Amino acid sequence: MASPTRTRSTFLTRYACGEPLTEDHFTTREHDVRELRANEVLLQTLALSVDPYLRGAMTGLDRYYIPQFTFDRPVHSMGVARVLDSRLDGYAVGDVVLGAIDWSDVSVLSAEEIAGRPVSGGALVRLSQPLRPLSHYLGVLGTTGVTAFFGVVGATRPRRGETIVLSGAAGGVGSVAGQIAQLLGARVIGLAGSPKKCEVLTKQLGFEAALDYRSPTLTDDLLALLPNGPDVYFDNVGGAVSQTVMSTMRKPARVIECGQIASYDDPDGGWTIDIRPIHQHGLRLESFSPSHYGEFRAGAVAQLGHWIDVGKIITLDTTYHGLKTVPTAFLDIFRGGNVGKSVVLLDSTVG
């Protein structure tokens, strides 16, 4: 079969710093697929992950841990693709691979480009057959699930019977982290952005309770549920919600800092913490990154896969279809429009 000569790609049109990111910051256009050269691979995109951390690479500020996206290259994120043609050792036509994939229907990547993308750790990994659902590789068996695993097992280290309050609980990381914490014997209270999401947490995932963080009585709601406060706060959002939770915690207690999605549009660099609750409650604040546990990643993925297979972890996905939906899928994370992991499928024949 002849290789495609035209493709569509989604580009960032301008940076957004100190203002909300919108669909107007992206454009999708058709262009030629250049001829394959030595040490390059031609990929058909099957599925793309959209993740909050990508927002930091759309600000124009060079203080983030991944480089800023440029306007002359498509945006990229973790994705799954099929090899259509290859002049790169180790990859054959028909291979299905996981890595940092362009927001394109079809793309050409060089070995240098693959190695230079920290989103994927500079790797393009061949997936073994038979394939699991593609959302698993981008969610619970990908960076999302690994972040949740090491956030709980490595950083939180919950003791049986401890109570954990978890923000962003209906998101990709939060929904997995809460289930892992329960498997380790913790009581989990989830915070989510709507009554419907709270119902998903309690009825589908088995959380002990869930609260709507938008409630004007959140402090009272937390204290009514936990008069002595939680032992652990697993923070995915930062901002005012986190300050509220910290003001209700027992003495002493632990705060595990995983993400600050509420602050990603802040030009000053994020959440400025009021340390008074930390001081008054004797809180221990700890941050982590899944990269700190790189040598243990394979074991974490194997354990997560086992938990899925035996029904101990339920996967939640919000699925979009087609390249043109990628910006909306990404922005919906910040609008509260997703439940669980957000994935865009570009090939209708795969799931």
Feature map (PLM): residue ranges:
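N-terminal Rossmann-like NAD(P) cofactor-binding module of classical short-chain dehydrogenase/reductase
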Residues: 98, 165, 211, 233-234
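NAD(P)H dinucleotide-binding glycine-rich loop of Rossmann-like/cofactor-binding domains
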Residues: 75-82, 90-168, 312
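C-terminal hydrophobic helical "lid"/dimerization subdomain
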Residues: 1-5, 294-351
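Glycine-rich phosphate-binding loop and adjacent beta-alpha segment
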Residues: 202, 240-313, 347-351
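Short glycine-centered segments of the SAM/dcSAM-binding site in methyltransferase folds
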Residues: 96, 163, 187, 253-254, ...
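Glycine-rich beta-strand-centered segment in the early N-terminal region that forms part
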Residues: 32-50, 59-103
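Mid-domain Rossmann-like dinucleotide-binding core that forms the NAD(H)/NADP(H) cofactor-binding site
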Residues: 138-216
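Short amphipathic alpha-helix with an adjacent loop that forms part of the alpha/beta core around
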Residues: 217-228
